[in-house]
A protein has these predicted regions:
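Active-site glycine/GP-rich loop and adjacent strand/helix microenvironment
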Residues: 1-258
C-alpha cells in the first residue's frame, strides 16, 4: 500500500505510461490518500479518484488528519467516511455561534485532544467544513464518521448570490480530460465582492472548450466564473511553490479585515 496525495498518483500513472511500465506488475494493492478529497458527499468516487482507478486497478482509501489533532479519521473497508476515535479526541461540528449544528448539516470541525500526549488543545477550530454521519457503519462500528471535507471555512466564496467552496469547482474541472492542470484564484473586485478566475492549461485550446466548461459550471453550480487559458509551466509554477508538500490549487488574494 502507498500513502500518497491523489494528484501525485496521477503523476505516477503518467510516468509509468511514458516509460512503458506495466502498473499491473507493480505489486501495489491500494493507496491511503491524504491532502485531497477522493469522494463526493454521497461517498461515491469523485472525478479525480475515478481517473486514478480507471487507469490503475487499486483500492483508494480516504483519510482526514492534521498535525494539531495528532490522530486521523480513516475509512474502513466499507468506505463510508472516516471513523472517529473518541478515546483520543472529542470532535464537535459547530456553527458560526459555536453551537452544535443539527443532524445532517455542515459545520466547522472543532476538536479537543484530551486523549493524546504532547499537544493538548481545547475546542481547536480546524477551519474545515464537514458533515457528521452517526448511523451505524456496515463494518459494525458505531462511532461517528466524517464525510468528505466540503471546503475550508476561510475559502468560502460568495459569488453572484451563490455560496461556493473550491472542492466543488475541482470536481467540475476534473470532468474535462482536456484540462491538464489548473489553479483557482479568488480576489475582491472594485465593489468589494468576491471574484473567481480559473487558469487552465490544455493541449487543445479553443473557445468551444471554454464554452463547454462554463456551461458545465452553470449546470452544476448555477454560476460561471472567468476562465483563462495559460501555459502549463506557468500554472505548475503556481501550483508547486518551493518547499510545498502538496499542490496548491487555490490562491486567495482577497483582502481580510485586520
Amino acid at each position: 500500500y502507498l500513502i500518497a496525495v491523489p494528484s501525485f498518483l496521477l503523476k505516477l500513472i503518467e510516468y509509468a505510461k511514458q516509460h512503458d511500465i506495466d502498473l499491473k506488475t507493480s505489486g501495489v494493492k491500494g493507496a491511503i490518500c491524504i491532502g485531497e478529497p477522493l469522494r463526493n458527499q454521497d461517498f461515491s468516487l469523485n472525478t479525480l479518484a475515478e481517473k486514478i482507478t480507471s487507469q490503475w486497478n487499486i483500492k483508494l482509501f480516504s483519510t482526514y488528519a492534521s498535525t494539531e489533532m495528532n490522530t486521523a479519521f480513516n475509512e474502513c473497508e466499507k468506505q463510508q467516511g472516516g471513523h472517529h476515535h473518541p478515546e483520543l479526541i472529542i470532535a464537535e461540528i459547530l456553527d458560526e455561534n459555536d453551537q452544535a449544528v443539527p443532524a445532517n448539516h455542515v459545520g466547522e470541525l472543532t476538536i479537543t485532544t484530551l486523549g493524546v500526549e504532547g499537544m493538548p488543545l481545547l475546542r481547536f477550530k480546524t477551519g474545515d467544513m464537514v458533515q457528521a454521519h452517526t448511523e451505524a457503519c456496515g463494518c459494525g462500528r458505531n462511532t461517528m464518521r466524517l464525510g468528505p471535507v466540503v471546503g475550508r471555512k476561510k475559502q468560502m466564496i460568495k459569488y453572484k448570490g451563490t455560496t461556493l467552496y473550491p472542492p466543488a469547482m475541482d470536481n467540475i474541472l476534473n470532468d474535462f480530460s482536456e484540462v491538464e492542470c489548473y489553479i483557482i484564484e479568488i480576489s475582491n473586485n472594485n465593489i468589494g465582492t468576491d471574484e473567481i478566475c480559473i487558469k487552465i492549461a490544455t493541449k487543445t485550446p479553443s473557445d468551444k472548450l471554454l464554452s463547454r466548461i462554463k456551461d458545465h459550471f452553470r449546470a452544476k453550480l448555477r454560476v460561471s466564473p472567468k476562465i483563462e487559458i495559460h501555459d502549463k509551466k506557468v500554472i505548475q509554477k503556481l501550483q508547486f511553490p518551493i518547499m510545498s508538500r502538496k499542490p496548491v490549487m487555490v490562491i486567495d488574494n482577497r483582502k481580510t479585515d485586520s
